[in-house]
């Protein structure tokens, strides 16, 4: 299904689900996890649901892209992070001195 592919859009897919647990299971049942979106009239409920989704970034109610926040995916959707302090750390090499 479209939920199993890493597609680039803009694309809107609509998949029926029974309840929030089923919706989270469908969203997380993929080897990819770059980004996603959650919309709800209840902002707190949307944020709680967004935390359950295994993606590197997720928009809540159409939130704008934040270039200061780390960007990158989970699972097979990329390695590491860009932007923000986590992105900066990708360029550091850590050394442990054993004295």
Q: Which functions belong to the PLM regions below?
A:
Residues 1-99:
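Conserved C-terminal structural/oligomerization subdomain of aldehyde/semialdehyde dehydrogenase
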